[in-house]
């Protein structure tokens, strides 16, 4: 019998920190200018009306209003912010 534990168990046990990507504000929610709406890697969702896109593809509101997710053609999505009436 071996008197030392197998080396395999000590080589495991690493994992990367989660990046907290995804939707931060949902359709119909009120947002203020500058609020982050969606964090993503690449353009899963494209910026629509009154929505800006950061260098890491983060979508954010340019005006105060209400979030609306829409289709952009057949196979794309976009998010827009419309003024609350």
From Swiss-Prot:
Q: Which InterPro entries match?
A: Ribosomal_bL27, Ribosomal_bL27_CS
Protein's UniProt keywords contain Ribonucleoprotein? yes
| Residue pairs linked by disulfide bridges in the UniProt entry | none
Stored Pfam families: Ribosomal_L27 (PF01016)
For this UniProt record, the keywords arranged alphabetically read as follows: Ribonucleoprotein, Ribosomal protein
Supply the name of the protein: Large ribosomal subunit protein bL27
Entry's Gene Ontology BP terms: translation
Listed Gene3D superfamilies: 2.40.50.100
Which PROSITE patterns does the entry mention? RIBOSOMAL_L27
Q: Where is this region: Disordered?
A: 1-22
Entry similarity comment: Belongs to the bacterial ribosomal protein bL27 family.
Alphabetically, the GO molecular function entries are: structural constituent of ribosome
Corresponding gene?
Answer: rpmA
Top-level taxon of origin: Bacteria
The top of its lineage is: Bacteria, Pseudomonadati, Thermodesulfobacteriota, Desulfuromonadia, Geobacterales
Any one of the GO CC terms? cytosolic large ribosomal subunit
User: Span of the secretion signal?
Assistant: none
